[in-house]
């Protein structure tokens, strides 16, 4: 079973749970989208093991389990996000934030909710919403 070597806890509720459709996430995770649970920087703690990190872009680094290879986390300057599939109870973490990177959304992946949609994270509208959440 994947991700047995890394365990983490958070001292707070997540800032949001969102879905990313960008090409980077598609390629890194091998899926049309990635669902992540985002926490303000400093609230996520690794209590067993720790991910191995690499710089994936100018604005983020990503971490994975060096034992099983599972993607675990990505980190921006102000937040850390873990992937819902790494959680013990993923069914309890329904997206409530937004859809990101919709310019790269694969056409057959149909969005069935009314969450806000943003083209990219450098979109001024996204930055404004992000700063208020």
Report the location of each language-model feature.
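A short Gly-Trp-Pro
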Residues: 2-133
């Amino acid at each position: 079973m994947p991700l047995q070597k890394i365990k983490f806890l958070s001292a707070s509720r997540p800032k949001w749970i969102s879905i990313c459709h960008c090409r980077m996430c598609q390629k890194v995770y091998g899926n049309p989208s990635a669902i992540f649970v985002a926490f303000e920087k400093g609230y996520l703690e690794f209590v067993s093991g720790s991910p191995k990190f690499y710089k994936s872009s100018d604005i983020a680094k990503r971490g994975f389990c060096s034992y099983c290879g599972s993607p675990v986390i990505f980190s921006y300057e102000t937040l850390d996000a873990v992937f819902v599939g790494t959680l013990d109870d993923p069914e309890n973490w329904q997206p409530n934030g937004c859809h990101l990177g919709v310019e790269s959304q694969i056409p057959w992946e149909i969005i069935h909710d009314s969450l806000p949609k943003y083209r990219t994270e450098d979109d001024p509208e996204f930055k404004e919403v992000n700063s208020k959440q």
